[in-house]
Amino acid sequence: MRVLGGRCGALLACLLLVLPVSEANFLSKQQASQVLVRKRRANSLLEETKQGNLERECIEELCNKEEAREVFENDPETDYFYPKYLVCLRSFQTGLFTAARQSTNAYPDLRSCVNAIPDQCSPLPCNEDGYMSCKDGKASFTCTCKPGWQGEKCEFDINECKDPSNINGGCSQICDNTPGSYHCSCKNGFVMLSNKKDCKDVDECSLKPSICGTAVCKNIPGDFECECPEGYRYNLKSKSCEDIDECSENMCAQLCVNYPGGYTCYCDGKKGFKLAQDQKSCEVVSVCLPLNLDTKYELLYLAEQFAGVVLYLKFRLPEISRFSAEFDFRTYDSEGVILYAESIDHSAWLLIALRGGKIEVQLKNEHTSKITTGGDVINNGLWNMVSVEELEHSISIKIAKEAVMDINKPGPLFKPENGLLETKVYFAGFPRKVESELIKPINPRLDGCIRSWNLMKQGASGIKEIIQEKQNKHCLVTVEKGSYYPGSGIAQFHIDYNNVSSAEGWHVNVTLNIRPSTGTGVMLALVSGNNTVPFAVSLVDSTSEKSQDILLSVENTVIYRIQALSLCSDQQSHLEFRVNRNNLELSTPLKIETISHEDLQRQLAVLDKAMKAKVATYLGGLPDVPFSATPVNAFYNGCMEVNINGVQLDLDEAISKHNDIRAHSCPSVWKKTKNS
């Protein structure tokens, strides 16, 4: 036997240091000596020249690290083997380290434990999920990976879904990576084809025809939609289309009217607003043709009131006084009362009026009653000086200081009482209902102006002060012939449109001569008793700059639009249209046209039904009807003359008229001067 050298002694010392003292089992001296010696084999010298054998060197005998190297002939394997070899020795040497041995249950004996040490694949270093095989090497190992795995130990899964050479793993929609593999899947609403990669859309509308209820089912990629007409919203619970109340969403700037499937915005035209181009917001109706609205308080406007007296004066003078009146007068009106004078007890009166454009005088007292009309026509829009003077035996009427009439009278016009002559004078109207007392009835309304008045030879003292305080009594400085609608009121007429001699039953033939000052407003409207507007002619600003459109409407539907007319000019525009239950014809400066289409016939049927009942005719705007009754509700602003069924309408003959509407005088167009 040979005794192991210092290496083995050092080894045992190391072993003793590794284990705690409490776990060591000490041997007797004899047993310890047996561990440190081994028997030499025969031919030991010859064996030392051969490559070591693991079985011979380290199992049948104990080996130190140098002897272990003779087995492996390289340091890496030796360094790997020897520490594990010592562990096997501690576990399986008879009587040694029983505590350590008890903890080792992988190998049944020393031979198995030692033989397993050089195998780098035991214990398995490869990832069990990812490896296919493990190949032992010199102090190394090689793991062969399954498809879908990579890494030295096959520990990393390959993400096939992110392979640049096979985009999205070849999946048409969803690529799901899994450990060592992947699979394709489809989004909701798609099914996988047999190739397990491509997806096909599911047509839910065909599979379930009633899936949308009363709505329309529209298949879309991966899903379906239940469609409703514009203005409706789909209700999932009832599976039906419900109207959207857009008005509850504050869609309109002023007034909103909701109806099934839509809504319409309206602006208060009577307050000077119109609907903007966006059909939602409101904007001020702008002036397109400025007019000269300058007035003077020295000019008394006789048509301030549609019904009633403009100015009332009372005189108490000495009994020697006689009636006299001097004034300048201007009008385009042909008929109306200039002034009416009477005694305190109403028994005697004098009327100075205009009839047929000429001065007319009617008088009545205890002695006589007379009527005289004469002189030149003075409703020419020029200022004419008029004087009426009671003389001793007659009444003298002069125009421009030239006598035109002398009316004989047997006595004084007004009888003095108690030494005083008391007389009441009324301008442009009667104080009460005196029509029955007149010698010849007359329409008292007169659109005209007077200035430089001198009544009862008392001058104008006290009268100017009264007029100066009231703007609506002031007359325009310059006027032209025509009717003026200021954009703040309407005039109403009762017109019978029935024509028993015509097969059509009724007809509305209208001629308009207009010179608008603003580009939006209702010019003419027929209104039924139920506050509907079966027919209207309106003006609106066009989308084209500096032009206007004419709208013909039945109720709130536009049946025809005449586009892009230049109406806001200093020249009047002439428009004609004729409508009956079957036809609509119109004439403008640009064309004459007969309108015919299927929808028009339906609308004319609506108009025909209304015309068989009672309708009222309005000029310049609408009465109090709902905003939704017509496309336009703003008042017309400008000059306009109207002829209906061959009759020229006189605003003095209207059933009612706003006081601001001027029946026979239209403001002139504003002309800029160099200094303005």
From Swiss-Prot:
Glycans are attached at N499, N509, N530. The modification 4-carboxyglutamate is found at E47, E48, E55, E57, E60, E61, E66, E67, E70, E73, E77. Changing I562L: In THPH5; uncertain significance. Residues 1-24 form the signal peptide. Disulfide bonds join C58-C63, C121-C134, C126-C143, C145-C154, C161-C175, C171-C184, C186-C199, C205-C217, C212-C226, C228-C241, C247-C256, C252-C265, C267-C282, C449-C475, C639-C666. It is linked to Thrombophilia due to protein S deficiency, autosomal dominant: A hemostatic disorder characterized by impaired regulation of blood coagulation and a tendency to recurrent venous thrombosis. InterPro entries: Coagulation_fac-like_Gla_dom (IPR017857), ConA-like_dom_sf (IPR013320), EGF-like_Ca-bd_dom (IPR001881), EGF-like_CS (IPR013032), EGF-like_dom (IPR000742), EGF-type_Asp/Asn_hydroxyl_site (IPR000152), EGF_Ca-bd_CS (IPR018097), GAS-SHBG-PROS (IPR051145). It comes from Homo sapiens. Residues 25-41 form a propeptide. GO terms for molecular function: calcium ion binding; endopeptidase inhibitor activity. Residues 117-155, 157-200, 201-242, 243-283 form the EGF-like domain. This is Vitamin K-dependent protein S. The gene is PROS1. It is found in: Secreted. Plasma. The lineage of its organism: Eukaryota, Metazoa, Chordata, Craniata, Vertebrata. Keywords: Blood coagulation, Calcium, Cleavage on pair of basic residues, Disease variant, Disulfide bond, EGF-like domain, Fibrinolysis, Gamma-carboxyglutamic acid, Glycoprotein, Hemostasis, Hydroxylation, Repeat, Secreted, Signal, Thrombophilia, Zymogen.
